[in-house]
Amino acid sequence: MLWAALAYSVGIVAGEYAWRPAHWWVVGALAFAMAAAYFAQRRVCLGRALVLGAVFLVGALHVQVRGAATHFDTSIQELADGRELQIMAHVIRDGQSRPASFGEIRQAVDVETEQVTADGAPGLPVRSGIRLTIYGSHAREALDEDSEESPGAIPLRLFHYGERIHFSAKLRPPRNFRNPGAFDYQGYLAANGIAALGSAKAENIESLPGFAGSRIELWRSRMHRSVIAKVHALWPARVAALIDAMVIGEEAFIDRDTRTDFQRSGTYHILVVSGMNVSILAFVVFWTLRRLRVGDVPATLLTVCGCVGYAFLTEVGAPVWRATLMCAIYLGTRLLYRERAMLNALGAAALGLLVFEPRQLFTASFQMTFVCVLIVAAIGLPTLERTSEFYKRALAHWQSEDYGKSLPPRVAQFRVDLRLIAGRTRQFVGRQWSLRLVRLSARFALGAFALLFISAVMQMGLALPMAYYFHRATTVALPANVLVVPLTQLMMPAAVATIALGYVSPWLARIPALVTTIAVQAITGTVRGLGGLRLADIRVPTPSTMMVLAAAGALVLAMVMARRRAPAAIVGLLAVFAAALALGFIAPLPNIRANVLEITSIDVGQGDSTLLVTPQGRTLLVDAGGPIGEGSSQLDFGEDVVSPYLWWRGISRLDAVAITHGHSDHIGGMAAVLKNFRPRELWVGLLPPSAALENLIAEAQSLGIKVVRHWQGDAFALGGANISVLWPARDAPPGAKPQNNDSLVLRVSYIDSAALLEGDAQKQAERDITARYHPTADLLRVGHHGSANATTPELLESVKPRFAVISVGSRNPFRLPRREVLDRLERSGARVFRTDTEGAVTFYLDGHSVTPSLAALR
């Protein structure tokens, strides 16, 4: 089954990237199938190879026939143009309430539209998914409006699955940040059936009579909410939030810092419900049933039913269902006494899931789930069978000399050594205790070795997906997992027992609740302690294609060699170890052009971020985007938007970063950039009183980054480019708070070509710059996102730009860039580029000319 799954997977990849007419695949599959039938009895190996060829062709056919099918009516996207719409819908996925900006709270729900009315026209029957954010105000902390366990109530009434509602909203289509390396948010929503985004005030939502949806899902949703309410009644809020995530799969109450600690320590799989939860649950249930003398078949059936029920309750999605399917197949094949049942279970589960949805092959979740199990089954277990498991079997009847005669010499000698140790300790603790202690010590040592080895192989094998998808080298993952995994194995059954007993009597739940609390606090303490080490925070660029192939090849080599002689197995393990080291500590060559000055305006929405690469390869990042205003944002623009682009470019460290001024849409993402890329210098200009600026400078100093103040008149070289600081004036007093005219304005030149970077400078600064310097530039980074109070005619007359780029957010509430600014730029003869329409824009200045390049066209 494993070979069939691999052939089907390769076929899916071929079908996705090498399109051919469908009849090609059909004819090929039929030809291979008939040839396989002909050779089935004559030449068995050839027949099997032909069967795999047919499976390969069926995989290619399947992914092309399925196409990029959407799960919604695309007509809703035609209505998502800013018009006020009247919408009738029903909730298909509810969520918890969370704090929002300015003292409000929000609940994100997915709704399926029933009828949409626009401009007073008759309602259109539209079936499509919308992610709706509902806002309320002045909330008190509570879990649910009808939760008896939580004190207080939230003014925002939470909406639940199946409720029919009517509301008015302006819809907008989901939009990706159009930078290479960016997360495909639009594709993620489409895969979940979401075609548009919208928001509404709670008081403007009208409840409609009736119910829409599945009664089974309604029951599941109610059970899910009930369990979460019970968790928050049994544990303090901080512990409850972690149990929600670790046991139930509800991550709404986990803050970003906690999430980052688990990621840095390489234990993120502990924080989220994953296949490990299913395996722990299956083991505990099966072991308990067998100890109660339940038969093998009934115990297997009850265990599988328990896993299915758990997957249904958590609603985590594909990872848990994949693990449940693998568990069911593994336990089923175990009943048939099939060898290597784990590999067969893995192949069958993968094949079944890919037949259901072939494109999940390209998701990080699918790949990491199956790579984990494949590493354990193909490398870990075969190695343990000849090491720790080999000796563990020697502990059976270990006092019997006759039993030892049938064992290999080294194992028999191991038994003799244990008996000698027991004999020497007998005088201290007695004969029976000495025998028990020696046997328990041997079992513990062998178990510890197995845990260490599996954890080490797992971390080495996962180095490639961790580097490629998450840009992390998990240097402390081995000790963290060795400490945390056993605690999780204790916490999981204790938490389940606590919740179950909590429905009977809170008094009965106290002891397992205490055990759970101790385990959770030990887990978080370990994670924070190890994740907080500087050694743990190693970020890596996207590996090169050659590095990906080499690391994957090393993993395959280790799997092939694991069942061969010991020297061959060691060679395979060393290859995986070398690949993991290379991924973590050997940076790829950056994707830059030599002997040109590059200026890239990164798409950060309604913010600002510019990457400069000098002719000699030195790098400078000016600003790092951020949210508008002081409100909270679900995005960390530095971590989620700017850093992925820099990693895609192969950049592992920046030479310098600059902040033009202290507004959040320019510096909101800079803290993450400082941590991820450890620049040598941080350039600043005016520093008015600002907690955000003070925190940023303190962060830079704690990281050993030199803070450099720059003023009008400063001029210096950087990697073959010349930089002149045109603003702020050296004698300019800082205001009471950050202002646009605090902006650090830079002119960067290379031979006879130059660029002017304005930040958010406005008329006052522009007039002073024009009068003092009369700057010229081929490229103008338009000030203040194209606002009318910047980009004055006087500046344009002096600069005479051939190109201009505006960093602006799509459908921004400020209606930027202003029409009059675009008209001024057009009259000046500048060709205008905008990040809201073109995405990231790169300009190459070779000293004599400027060449623009759009990321969307690469």
Protein language model regions, located:
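Hydrophobic alpha-helical transmembrane segments
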Residues: 1-4, 215, 247-252, 314-320, ...
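N-terminal leader/targeting segments
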Residues: 1-87, 134, 138-140, 322, ...
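Hydrophobic alpha-helical transmembrane segments in multi-pass membrane proteins
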Residues: 3, 11, 198, 253-476, ...
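Alpha-helical transmembrane segments of polytopic membrane proteins
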Residues: 23-33, 369, 481-486, 544-548
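Membrane-interface helix/helix-cap signal primarily in integral membrane proteins
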Residues: 58-269, 629, 637-647, 653, ...
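Non-globular, low-confidence helical/coil segments that flank catalytic cores
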Residues: 157, 164, 168, 188, ...
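Alpha-helical transmembrane segments of integral membrane proteins
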Residues: 158, 297-301, 342-348, 447-450, ...
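Hydrophobic alpha-helical segments of integral membrane proteins
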Residues: 219-231, 242, 250, 258, ...
